Amino acid sequence: MSIFTPVNNKTLTNIVVVRYKKGAAKFEIACYPSKVQSYRSKIEKDLNEVIQIHRIFTNVSKGIIAKKDELIKAFGTDNEQEIILLILEKGELQVSSKERDNQSEQTFKDIATIVAEKCVNTETQRPIPVSIIEKAMKDVHYSIHPTKSSKQQSLEVIKQISSVIPIQRAQMRLNITIPTKESKTLNRDKLMVLVSKIEEEDRDGGGLSIVCLVDPGSYRKIDELIKQETKGKGFIDIINLAVAKEGETKINETGKSAPTSTTTTTTTTTSSSK
């Protein structure tokens, strides 16, 4: 699509329009193809790579720019940057039905991949193939939300498909290191409430080192506790973001889990110090 606008006599080429309705009024922004979804998925963060022209239109195809009083009436402000961000986040992407179907299909696959990376089978603690996740999503009739990122939707999917397959968030493996002085005053009971399993514990040299498994939802609480208890001197290393046994789990027609040993589990490893 090529559109001529009166703004600096600029011709907009190869664009997609994001439209936001506010009552009877509608407002549009001109964006680069494929960049809107990348921005919503937190992949692209540079607005200049997403927005073709930093102006708000009432009709992009005709080059009609929204008036100041129209913006104030609809949004309570004429700050175009704020309004552009709102439209970009919550507006409806104007694409053809074929393009919409292709985007929806890709988002569907992206969500299933994220879920497979984050989760394990509840019964076997093994990874679940993406194909099984996709089938479960279809079984619960999951509908793609065009304005939500794949990551956001993956959390919704985990909850919904747990009704048809045994699935849970994979646990994280952490290495908590606390210096000698601080380890003596550590409130161990508070820490143990947040830890699922201690795999190793070492007091060599006077300090304390604990390798443990934790639920992802407990990570932030553990991080805050260690900071508080050690006055910022403790460290948390993330050994594995998702811990799973080797091999994948097959789900048969009866819903039972049948582990295989043909695939080796891959987990993402990162490290952070607090």
From Swiss-Prot:
Query: Which InterPro entries does UniProt cross-reference here?
Result: Ribosome_mat_SBDS_N_sf, Sdo1/SBDS, Sdo1/SBDS-like, SDO1/SBDS_C, SDO1/SBDS_central, Sdo1/SBDS_central_sf, SDO1/SBDS_N
Q: Decide whether keyword Calcium is in the record.
A: no
This protein's record includes keyword ATP-binding: no
* Intracellular or extracellular location(s): Cytoplasm; Nucleus, Nucleolus; Nucleus, Nucleoplasm; Cytoplasm, Cytoskeleton, Spindle
What cellular component GO annotations does this protein have?
A: cytoplasm; nucleolus; nucleoplasm; pseudopodium; spindle
Any Pfam family = SBDS_N
Q: Which keywords does this chain's UniProt record carry?
A: Cytoplasm, Cytoskeleton, Nucleus, Ribosome biogenesis
Q: So what does this one do?
A: Required for the assembly of mature ribosomes and ribosome biogenesis. Triggers the GTP-dependent release of ribosome maturation factors from 60S pre-ribosomes in the cytoplasm, thereby activating ribosomes for translation competence by allowing 80S ribosome assembly. Required for normal levels of protein synthesis. May play a role in cellular stress resistance. May play a role in cellular response to DNA damage. May play a role in cell proliferation.
What is said about its interaction partners and assembly?
Associates with the 60S ribosomal subunit.
Q: What is this protein called?
A: Ribosome maturation protein SBDS
